[in-house]
């Protein structure tokens, strides 16, 4: 059973998501407690492969209030856990022009914190405008159909 803690809705607005992957996260005790309370922000975070390891940057986890001296640094880089084969496949794909790894959601699967990564390509401004126009048109059609019945 999955319990979703945080979603990165802005990623769907800023990027075309091509593929999705699941990875575990190496966390400290106070980070897990803080995540369980929902005190996490994925907005500006991204993942990068360095020395054959997958790392997550800029994910903000607020310090745990009862953590005192055992607390963690809120924006420290966190190691993501995936099979070496999967990491190498991702490494090849992220070397392509314009592709990046963006976290889409953070959730607990059983007792383990997992993150869903998206292989993404950045949207241009006109793509965003086009998408908004389509959404508005669909909303207008829906409104017209509702008014008719």
From Swiss-Prot:
Function comment: Required for rescue of stalled ribosomes mediated by trans-translation. Binds to transfer-messenger RNA (tmRNA), required for stable association of tmRNA with ribosomes. tmRNA and SmpB together mimic tRNA shape, replacing the anticodon stem-loop with SmpB. tmRNA is encoded by the ssrA gene; the 2 termini fold to resemble tRNA(Ala) and it encodes a 'tag peptide', a short internal open reading frame. During trans-translation Ala-aminoacylated tmRNA acts like a tRNA, entering the A-site of stalled ribosomes, displacing the stalled mRNA.
Family assignment from sequence similarity: Belongs to the SmpB family.
Subcellular location: Cytoplasm
Keywords, comma-separated and alphabetical: Cytoplasm, RNA-binding
InterPro entries hit by this protein: SmpB, SsrA-bd_prot, SsrA-bd_prot_CS
Record GO biological process: trans-translation
Molecular function GO terms recorded: RNA binding
Name of the protein described by the UniProt record: SsrA-binding protein
Gene3D superfamilies, per the entry: 2.40.280.10
SUPFAM superfamilies to which the protein is assigned, alphabetical: Small protein B (SmpB)
Disulfide pattern: none
Pfam family, one: SmpB
An annotated GO cellular component: cytosol
């Amino acid at each position: 059973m999955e319990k979703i803690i945080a979603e990165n809705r802005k990623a769907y607005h800023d990027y075309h998501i091509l593929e999705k992957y699941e990875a575990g996260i190496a966390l400290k005790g106070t980070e897990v407690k803080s995540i369980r309370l929902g005190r996490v922000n994925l907005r500006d975070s991204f993942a990068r492969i360095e020395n054959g390891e997958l790392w997550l940057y800029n994910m903000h986890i607020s310090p745990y209030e009862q953590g005192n001296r055992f607390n963690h640094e809120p924006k420290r880089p966190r190691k993501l856990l995936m099979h070496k084969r999967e990491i190498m496949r991702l490494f090849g794909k992220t070397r392509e022009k314009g592709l990046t790894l963006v976290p889409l959601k953070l959730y607990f699967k059983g007792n383990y914190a997992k993150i869903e990564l998206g292989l993404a390509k950045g949207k241009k401004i006109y793509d965003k405008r086009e998408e908004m126009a389509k959404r508005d048109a669909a909303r207008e059609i829906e409104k017209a159909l509702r008014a008719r019945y």
